[in-house]
Swiss-Prot record:
Gene (name only): rimK
A Pfam match: RimK
Enzyme Commission number, as recorded: 6.3.2.-
Highest classification ranks of the organism: Bacteria, Pseudomonadati, Pseudomonadota, Gammaproteobacteria, Aeromonadales
Protein name: Probable alpha-L-glutamate ligase
MF (Gene Ontology): ATP binding; metal ion binding; ribosomal S6-glutamic acid ligase activity
């Protein structure tokens, strides 16, 4: 196959691994800087141009679109889809999962376990909002945040009121969530590929920190997940419409609680912790998806 990888960082571990594995399996791979792609949105002959040339057709595209460029990145991916290029994850599914509020509402509708989560617009409603999620301590999250940025643990009612009011008054959209104390600064990242958990790791926050993101100094180790956790991760990815996803789960007294469903999960931490060839599983699935697309009707 001829595969395009949309990535702003060709030397990023995840991008390099996908290139290496795909090439080792006989595929032709080109890494394209997402923001350098530009589009001709024509009715009969849509095209994508890159560095002064019109791109030839590809069999498949792997989107590695960062959260900060979701709008433009999904537009580029839609253009590939208009040109009948098969996408590892669809533009619709990526957009759905990147909207954290919408994602929470969809997961809630399907009965997936979640931390109690509040959303409000007016500062007049802050005291009741805090009560609604169980009071302090609680967690405030910027809807546009990523890698633990814009996530604040408020340990008292006064601190919670101040932080929430400050965010709202500066026109930031936030979620207010209950703090799951029994998780003890740890979460589980499940890598789901084609409806199966192919790898999992437990991420533990640094002492004095509650955010377990590896970008914030958290550590990772292999973990054996329960059947309920496995089913929750698979179902969460399915609800988002993602064939490849990183599903973040907290262990709580009332079972697994989903924090986030990531459409472009990093591979370095989970491959190192689990010892699993996740990149290989992704390329194998891409091959399977391509074979299904080109299989003649019976």
């Amino acid at each position: 196959m001829k595969i395009a990888i949309l990535s702003r960082e060709p030397n990023n571990y995840s991008t390099r691994r996908l290139v290496e594995v795909a090439q080792a399996r006989g595929h032709q791979v080109e890494v394209l800087d997402t923001l350098r792609c530009y589009m001709n949105i024509a009715s009969h002959n849509p095209s994508i141009h890159y560095e002064g040339r019109e791109l030839e057709s590809y069999d498949a595209v792997i989107p590695r679109i960062g959260a900060s460029i979701t709008f433009y990145g999904t537009a580029v991916l839609r253009q590939f889809e208009m040109m009948n290029t098969m996408a590892l994850n669809s533009s619709v599914a990526i957009s759905r999962s990147r909207d954290k509020l919408r994602a929470m509402q969809l997961l809630s509708r399907h009965g997936i376990g979640l931390p109690v989560t509040g959303y409000a617009h007016s500062t007049h409603d802050v005291p009741d909002l805090i009560t609604m999620v169980g009071g302090a301590p609680l967690v405030v999250k910027l809807l546009e945040g990523t890698q633990g940025i814009g996530v604040v643990l408020c340990e008292t009612q006064k601190a919670a009121e101040s932080v929430i009011e400050a965010f709202i008054q500066t026109n930031n959209n936030i979620l207010v969530q209950e703090y799951i104390r029994e998780a003890n600064g740890a979460d589980i990242r499940c890598l789901v590929v084609n409806g199966k958990v192919v790898a999992a790791m437990r991420r533990q926050a640094q002492p004095g920190e509650f955010r377990s993101n590896l970008h914030r100094g958290g550590t990772a180790e292999a973990i054996k997940i329960s059947p309920e956790e496995r089913a929750t991760a698979v179902q969460a990815a399915k609800i988002m419409g993602l064939d490849v996803a990183g599903v973040d789960i907290l262990r709580s007294a009332r079972g697994p609680l989903v924090l986030e469903v990531n459409s472009s999960p990093g591979l370095q931490g989970v491959e190192a912790a689990s010892g699993k060839d996740v990149a290989g599983k992704i390329i194998e699935f891409l091959e399977l998806k391509a074979s299904r697309k080109h299989k003649p009707a019976e």
